[in-house]
């Protein structure tokens, strides 16, 4: 068995609360989002893990979640690498719009296709496949080698950037991944084999709370 990979979706953001498409826009966490990140950190502290390095995105909601988790495991000063390769899916022209307003403008069916299809992007934005096309190579070059060397690695990122990782790690089809939602602040702990396959997966919390 090799190292450990922990994935955590950021806590609720201001724009999650306002029902806005966020993407690469940069709102901060809400009070609930802070509590969710702290709860995820406490779950990891209770689990007894100590990290060797952390990765997060270029966006403040993921960075703050990462820091709150590290604070909870008493590793506030741990080396943390920030990279936009881990950013949320870019919603393009939908970014900043209220989801109900978007449905009124383009129609409920079209917005549903943009949100939930695997390979149809919104205007000027990314599909889930596009998101995976930047997340997965970064994982292979920057994150996976650390895990395979035996390190314990934290990745605090976003719903869609993490779903694109989970799709490959869990061996999900594109139909299965479209039905998967990741709860905010709930850590997923992967133990990897030396050949990079998954030896075990534990979810430290209630993933049914995903939205």
From Swiss-Prot:
Annotated membrane-spanning segments are none
Residues of the active site are: 10, 88
Per the UniProt record, the site (Transition state stabilizer) maps to 158
Tell me which residues bind substrate. 9-16, 22-23, 61, 88-91, 99, 115-116, 159-160
Which cysteines are disulphide-bonded? none
Q: Which Gene3D superfamilies match?
A: Phosphoglycerate mutase-like
State the Pfam families in the record.
His_Phos_1
Q: Which GO terms fall under biological process for this protein?
A: gluconeogenesis; glycolytic process
Tell me the pathway: Carbohydrate degradation; glycolysis; pyruvate from D-glyceraldehyde 3-phosphate: step 3/5
Q: Which domain of life is it from?
A: Bacteria
Its keywords, alphabetically, are:
Gluconeogenesis, Glycolysis, Isomerase
Q: What class of enzyme is it?
A: isomerase
Function comment? Catalyzes the interconversion of 2-phosphoglycerate and 3-phosphoglycerate.
Name of the protein described by the UniProt record: 2,3-bisphosphoglycerate-dependent phosphoglycerate mutase
Organism equals Sinorhizobium medicae (strain WSM419)
